[in-house]
Amino acid sequence: MKINVRGSTMVRPAEETPRVRLWNSSLDLVVPRFHTPSVYFFRRGEAAAAEGGSYFDGERMRRALAEALVPFYPMAGRLAHDEDGRVEIDCNGEGVLFVEADAPGATVDDFGDFAPTMDLKRLIPTVDYTDGISSFPILVLQVTHFKCGGVALGVGMQHHVADGFSGLHFINSWADLCRGVPIAVMPFIDRTLVRARDPPAPSHPHVEYQPAPAMLAPEPPQALTAKPAPPPTAVDIFKLSRSDLGRLRSQLPRGEGAPRYSTYAVLAAHVWRCASLARGLPAEQPTKLYCATDGRQRLQPSLPDGYFGNVIFTATPLAEAGRVTGSLADGAATIQSALDRMDSGYCRSALDYLELQPDLSALVRGAHTFRCPNLGLTSWVRLPIHDADFGWGRPVFMGPGGIAYEGLAFVLPSASGDGSLSVAISLQAEHMEKFRKMIFDF
């Protein structure tokens, strides 16, 4: 796929904004340090064609973006270090990168089921990290026009500034302004609300921040002298219909007194089971599942509407593979128990635990966290991922623009609201071949 860049602009806030250094909470610092990639796809429908004018007009989008950056001013800043070396946000108004491009030989249909492959990654501007954390924009955007008339909006958002909920709050507010609608909820920019207690008093061991289990099998002899190349990975996406999800639930105990499991717990148990079987994990192999949970409503008192930052706490069910690959009910019970534990007391304890750690960077999750035998499964089902209507209609798809690590997966809702859920996942290529056969075998 050939992409021609029409032009790129650094868009600054439309008005003067506060010149401050924004303190980051521990939750803002235990996230991956790169830009989180996501991509929206839009089809040019009859209504947009009849309206006339320029579809996804760059000038209109830039004006709205500049307006949005006034209340969301940290987005226009740069990362910096305070005197103790802690990462903070320098709200200096230097702006966000906005790129316009064409893919004259491609159509929206060419992306098929929108699996987060390298083709999707090319729809997002590349960030150069070589000159230090203050050298690059916190937010990079690219509007790519296809020959079919459709458009992709690629988003790269530095994770220190926002989690999924806050990131979408910004994107959807920008879209509202672009179609002439005022921002519904203004951002609340004060991260001290998720500061640890004084003095910190963690009341749980917080297994979520403990090292991930390693494979029980010993390293092969050659690994002692030379580091082997990591096995090739594959990325795919699988759509489970409402009927599929119903058939999964039918495997669980029913009737009076039967335990209740969330849809996430049921689907996560199925994905964890399939991945463990595809990986050939022995029954005694410990495996950990990382489940991102939003703390906004879990913390008491709850955070203000529009709280802008990271409020992700992680539930981490841990079990031997034999339990995970057994009945669906066993896996779902393990997951639901971990999720139910995530109340305000647990979350406050997690903040205190993080405050006592000498080096938060040691807790940042990465390839070492999610790789075999472990798994990360992040749900975007409750996020408003399809609400970005810039004035030319809602997206037909929104999802990750890439999956950085083997063993990481995302659950996505359907844009049509048909009750289906899609699982985008990265696994070792040989494991993916088996996973493809298992995911619909129930």
From Swiss-Prot:
Residue stretches in coiled coil: none
EC number: 2.3.1.-
Top-rank EC class of the record's enzyme: transferase
Pfam family name, one: Transferase
Domain of life: Eukaryota
GO function term, MF aspect, one: acyltransferase activity, transferring groups other than amino-acyl groups
Keyword terms of this UniProt record: Acyltransferase, Transferase
Disulfide bond entries: none
Tissue distribution of the protein: Expressed in roots and leaves. Expressed at low levels in stems and seeds.
UniProt-annotated catalytic positions: H159, D389
Function, in words: Hydroxycinnamoyl transferase that catalyzes the transfer of an acyl from p-coumaryol-CoA to various acyl acceptors. Can use feruloyl-CoA and caffeoyl-CoA as acyl donors.
Family: Belongs to the plant acyltransferase family.
Protein name, UniProt field: Hydroxycinnamoyltransferase 2
Gene behind this protein: HCT2
